[in-house]
């Protein structure tokens, strides 16, 4: 039986979602474990985060991954990794620790883990974490959320159906309650539950990963188990969900559905517009306004209540897009952008805005160069679009 797996990887950004881990027991053709490697080790979205739980732990800023699930087998075990990214993996180091046992009962259940996603979640239907058929016991999951609307993503009731029942024998009271926390989620780690990732702003694009392990309280089933959770109260949200479920059951198991392609697993890794350079903002004095200047280009932005921050979106190199936020604004609030130019040169100006239910409508009103002023047509950007 395998008792411990350790890996550390050097690869392109978001490799945790691009490298697929599979495990096969006793010569089976269909894997009993199939998941992006980062999600299997408890952290979603292809990101690296520390995590400390009983069966899974990650350290070194999430780059050292350890698994302690017991994985028995009778005759053989085969573990594979497949790189579905565009670049070769620079380094892949691993240990797999196992012991030869005198014997195992023939009905010993084997370890299973499956990645699923629904992007976006469908109205009127619970998100399905696991559907398994046979005899075994469910031992937990992790769930990753990418917000498509602002606010609290939770309040979805968990519903677990055992052996084909029409009404769930386990019916919870809210997302954070199933994941053993309360009054929302915050980053925390415990032996059987925790939250390695919760971006604090709860804005469009914010990401979270939570976990719950039923080790002292496994959920047994004789014929089948179906583990589901609402996405928002009464399924009123359409966030992007992904998960890994963990369970033990006797083989053969039903084959898993085909894993979604890598680009579908990374909806937040946005391609950069051409010639885009991230600014280095420095606050400057500008009377009653908030003003920031890019230390490299000299570009300045001034407005009321202006705050630089990092957005929840990443480019394809793994860097988060910076943003300037204006808060406490009303109709007519303005932001003024200025930058040095060379006399006689021509310039194209491209403005990029994030969209979301709290982003407002933006009107580009005109360009002023010294004593010259150029009026633009009322070019309205509807930031309320999703």
Report each predicted region and the residues it spans.
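Beta-strand-centric surfaces of beta-sandwich/beta-rich domains
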Residues: 1-276
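Extracytoplasmic
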Residues: 162, 268-386
């Amino acid at each position: 039986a395998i008792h411990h797996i350790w890996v550390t990887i050097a690869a392109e950004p978001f490799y945790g979602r691009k490298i697929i881990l599979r495990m096969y027991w006793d010569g089976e053709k269909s894997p009993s474990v199939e998941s992006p490697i980062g999600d299997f080790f408890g952290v979603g979205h292809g990101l690296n985060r520390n995590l400390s739980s009983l069966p899974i732990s990650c350290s070194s800023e999430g780059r050292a991954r350890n698994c302690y699930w017991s994985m028995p087998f009778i005759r053989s075990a085969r573990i594979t990794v497949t790189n579905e990214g565009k670049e070769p993996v620079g380094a892949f180091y691993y240990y797999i620790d196992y012991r030869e046992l005198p014997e195992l009962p023939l009905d010993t259940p084997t370890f299973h883990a499956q990645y699923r996603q629904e992007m976006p979640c469908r109205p009127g239907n619970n998100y399905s974490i696991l559907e398994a058929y046979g005899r075994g016991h469910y031992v937990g999951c992790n769930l990753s959320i990418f917000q498509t609307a602002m606010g609290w993503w939770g309040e979805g009731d968990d519903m677990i159906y055992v052996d084909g029942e029409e009404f769930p024998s386990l019916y919870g009271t809210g997302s954070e309650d199933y994941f053993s926390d309360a009054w929302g989620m915050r980053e925390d780690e415990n032996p059987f539950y925790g939250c390695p990732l919760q971006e604090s702003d709860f804005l469009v694009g914010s990401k979270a990963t939570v976990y719950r392990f039923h080790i002292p309280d496994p959920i047994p089933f004789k014929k089948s188990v179906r583990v589901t959770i609402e996405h928002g109260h009464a399924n009123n949200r359409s966030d992007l969900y992904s998960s890994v479920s963990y369970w033990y059951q006797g083989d053969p198991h039903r084959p898993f559905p085909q894993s979604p392609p890598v680009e579908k697993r990374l909806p937040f890794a946005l391609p950069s517009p051409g010639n885009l350079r991230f600014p280095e903002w420095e606050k400057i004095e500008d009377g009653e306004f908030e003003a920031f200047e890019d230390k490299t280009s000299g570009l300045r932005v001034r407005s009321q209540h202006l705050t630089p921050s990092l957005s929840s979106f990443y480019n394809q190199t793994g860097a988060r897009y910076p943003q300037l936020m204006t808060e406490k604004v009303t109709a007519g609030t303005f932001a003024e952008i200025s930058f040095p130019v060379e006399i006689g040169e021509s310039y194209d100006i491209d403005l990029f805005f994030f969209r979301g239910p709290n982003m407002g409508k933006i009107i580009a009103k005109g360009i002023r160069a010294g004593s010259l002023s150029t009026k633009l047509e009322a070019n309205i950007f509807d930031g309320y679009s999703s």
